[in-house]
């Protein structure tokens, strides 16, 4: 196994930092149980998009204008990966304990690698597939090792599976956009679209007798919304997409398995739970799987290079100038 080069080490650092921030979102989300879901998530994404757009303007970072087909991909990313995934995740935690949700979401590394391989019409790299299986098993074991263990229910399983599908959709739908638009532009446009969609949905729900679109947040809710907006949305999306550009789908996706581990650590640090011996062993297994998958190998799905072009909204993969198909996609948790 070869050592990582500078570019790959940067990608690993970006992915690892993203996981730490997302792990902290569990505590933040628990503070929003009494806050309007659709309106709150709309504010989160709109604010994140505006903050990043302002930052791009101040730093003179270009935001390329999307083409028609790219707008279609961005709309799908906003609906499925951002708005859909976040709302489904919240609904899952309302009807199921975090452990059971974590078991399902922990399968993300394995699902994304298999999905990417199927879409690219090739077999996944053997070592990365093995690493993904180790990460998935360790992630599930970390939840099984909790104080109470997961309590599965039909509703909880359905919501969790939907959230997992949304997370995988985030990867598959973002991949064709990154080479030309870049991580910053993709995040700005997708957050803006997701925020507008959620705001419209909140307004429709309100006219149908649903909850208010927004409410005056308590100090704790305001802090939670700020953390989710800045750290878990604006920072995480750019960092994760940057990691994917450097590591590729298979190796970046492995870091998703660390999210339940960081969540358990956050719970232990805040004194709201404990880590059992099984949970600790599971954490070590996940770490071993990530290290195994990070090693270079010939059959790794490559990160996208410049020179790709998106020919139509129905094209799942972009073709490089040399005629080869890039297979790089990623999965992001947008809790």
Q: What spans do the regions from the language model cover?
A:
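Glycine-/small-residue-enriched transmembrane alpha-helix faces in small-molecule transporters
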Residues: 1-43, 48-50, 87, 91, ...
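Hydrophobic alpha-helical transmembrane segments of multi-pass integral membrane proteins
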Residues: 9-14, 39-55, 76, 130-137, ...
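Helix-helix packing/entry segments at the starts of transmembrane helices
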Residues: 15-19, 42-43, 82, 86, ...
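Specific transmembrane alpha-helical segments of multi-pass solute transporters/efflux pumps
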Residues: 21-26, 53-105, 141, 229-247
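Membrane-interface helix termini and inter-helical loops of multi-pass transporters
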Residues: 27-35, 94, 143-154, 205-220, ...
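Hydrophobic/aromatic residues within transmembrane alpha-helices
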Residues: 32, 40, 44, 92, ...
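Specific alpha-helical transmembrane segments that line the substrate/conduction pathway
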Residues: 39-50, 81, 89-123, 127, ...
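Hydrophobic transmembrane alpha-helices of multi-pass small-molecule transport proteins
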Residues: 52, 115, 124-146, 257-258, ...
């Amino acid at each position: 196994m070869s050592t990582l080069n500078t570019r790959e080490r940067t990608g690993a650092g970006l992915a690892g930092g993203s996981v730490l921030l997302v792990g902290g979102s569990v505590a933040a989300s628990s503070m929003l149980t009494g806050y309007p879901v659709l309106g709150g998530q709309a504010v989160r994404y709109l604010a994140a998009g505006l903050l990043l757009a302002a930052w791009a303007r101040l730093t003179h970072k270009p935001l390329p204008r999307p083409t028609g087909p790219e707008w279609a991909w961005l709309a799908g990313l906003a609906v499925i990966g951002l708005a859909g995934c976040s709302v489904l995740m919240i609904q899952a935690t309302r009807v199921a304990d975090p452990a059971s949700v974590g078991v399902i979401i922990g399968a993300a590394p394995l699902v994304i690698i298999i999905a990417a391989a199927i879409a690219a019409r090739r077999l996944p790299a053997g070592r990365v597939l093995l690493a993904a299986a180790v990460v998935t098993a360790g992630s599930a074991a970390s939840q099984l090792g909790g104080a109470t263990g997961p309590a599965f229910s039909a509703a909880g399983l359905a919501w969790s599976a939907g959230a997992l599908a949304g997370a995988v959709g985030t990867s598959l739908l973002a991949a064709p956009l990154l080479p030309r638009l870049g991580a910053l532009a993709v995040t700005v446009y997708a957050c803006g679209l997701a925020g507008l969609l959620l705001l419209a949905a909140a307004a429709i729900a309100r006219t149908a007798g649903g909850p208010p679109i927004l409410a005056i947040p308590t100090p704790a809710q305001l802090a939670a919304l700020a953390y989710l907006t800045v750290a878990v949305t604006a920072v995480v999306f750019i960092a994760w997409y940057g990691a994917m550009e450097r590591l590729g789908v298979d190796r970046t996706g492995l870091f998703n398995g660390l999210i339940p581990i960081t969540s358990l650590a956050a719970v232990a640090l805040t004194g709201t739970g404990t880590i059992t011996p099984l949970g600790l062993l599971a954490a070590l297994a996940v770490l071993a799987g990530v290290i195994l998958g990070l090693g270079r190998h010939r059959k790794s799905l490559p990160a996208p290079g410049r020179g790709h072009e998106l020919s139509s909204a129905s094209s799942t993969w972009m073709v490089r100038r040399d005629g080869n198909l890039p297979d790089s996609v990623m999965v992001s948790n947008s809790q």
